[in-house]
From Swiss-Prot:
Function: Accepts ubiquitin from the E1 complex and catalyzes its covalent attachment to other proteins. Catalyzes 'Lys-11'-linked polyubiquitination. Acts as an essential factor of the anaphase promoting complex/cyclosome (APC/C), a cell cycle-regulated ubiquitin ligase that controls progression through mitosis. Acts by specifically elongating 'Lys-11'-linked polyubiquitin chains initiated by the E2 enzyme UBE2C/UBCH10 on APC/C substrates, enhancing the degradation of APC/C substrates by the proteasome and promoting mitotic exit.
Composition bias type Basic residues, residue spans: 209-223
Pathway membership, UniProt: Protein modification; protein ubiquitination
Organism taxonomic ancestry: Eukaryota, Metazoa, Chordata, Craniata, Vertebrata
Catalysed transformations (reactions): S-ubiquitinyl-[E1 ubiquitin-activating enzyme]-L-cysteine + [E2 ubiquitin-conjugating enzyme]-L-cysteine = [E1 ubiquitin-activating enzyme]-L-cysteine + S-ubiquitinyl-[E2 ubiquitin-conjugating enzyme]-L-cysteine
Gene, per the UniProt record: Ube2s
Post-translational modification: Autoubiquitinated by the APC/C complex during G1, leading to its degradation by the proteasome.
Enzyme class: transferase
Organism: Rattus norvegicus
GO cellular component: anaphase-promoting complex; nucleus
InterPro entries for this protein: Ub_conjugating_enzyme (IPR050113), UBQ-conjugat_E2_core (IPR000608), UBQ-conjugating_AS (IPR023313), UBQ-conjugating_enzyme/RWD (IPR016135)
Protein name: Ubiquitin-conjugating enzyme E2 S
Active site: 95 (glycyl thioester intermediate)
Phosphoserine, modified sites: 174
Length: 223
């Protein structure tokens, strides 16, 4: 995606830079911002799943994209980590009023991030982008919560501990481009360090040992 920095007036760039710098140094609780030094209009963010919700224990990557008309027009928000939530579409698009009709130029990036975090606590099924999640939230909360927890464990599970959250934050800060659905992401069920990978590694070691034993027997027969 092309940068919109060159399309923003200098005074808007200064305002964005000032707020992003403040957010990086003093972020809201459970939120971290990783500015793109080459493109201030593309903000990478992590949000910890709030306690008492099906998203607790997960760390969710998202991004905010500032358009060329910002702040007259709201930024666009996307979850990069797969999540089961009524207000998050298949492509990760976030539907929340502050990013649509309730937006005003006076609202800042901090307000947007706090609103998105609140959306994890209080989903709005009436403006659902994921209709199945919205229906379950209204008709069968236990099933909705189970589905949301499952995806949190699979895709945000690498960050269910403080050390995992720190590792994920370091990866994001260093410009890691792999999403949490990448099959090589540590902690995911099929990841490079996950249980399935360890199982395959054990089977490979057994086959290698058996081959060495067979080769040794063949060598002894030749003597």
């Amino acid at each position: 995606m092309n940068s919109n920095v060159e399309n923003l007036p200098p005074h808007i760039i200064r305002l964005v830079y000032k707020e992003v710098t403040t957010l990086t140094a003093d972020p809201p609780d459970g939120i971290k911002v990783f500015p793109n030094e080459e493109d201030l209009t593309d903000l990478q963010v992590t949000i910890e799943g709030p306690e008492g919700t099906p998203y607790a224990g997960g760390l969710f990557r998202m991004k905010l994209l500032l358009g060329k008309d910002f702040p007259a027009s709201p930024p666009k928000g996307y979850f990069l980590t797969k999540i089961f939530h009524p207000n998050v579409g298949p492509n990760g698009e976030i539907c929340v009023n502050v990013l649509k009709r309730d937006w005003t130029a006076e609202l800042g990036i901090r307000h947007v991030l706090l609103t998105i975090k609140c959306l994890l606590i209080h989903p709005n099924p009436e403006s659902a982008l994921n209709e199945e999640a919205g229906r379950l939230l209204l008709e069968n909360y236990e099933e909705y919560a189970a589905r949301a927890r499952l995806l949190t464990e699979i895709h945000g599970g690498a960050c269910s501990t403080s050390s995992g959250r720190a590792e994920a934050s370091r990866d994001l800060a260093s410009g890691a481009s792999a999403s949490s659905t990448d099959p090589m992401t540590p902690g995911v069920l099929g990841g490079a360090e996950g249980p399935m990978a360890k199982k395959h590694a054990g089977e490979r070691d057994k086959k290698l040992a058996a081959k060495k034993k067979l080769d040794k027997k063949r060598a002894l027969r030749r003597l």
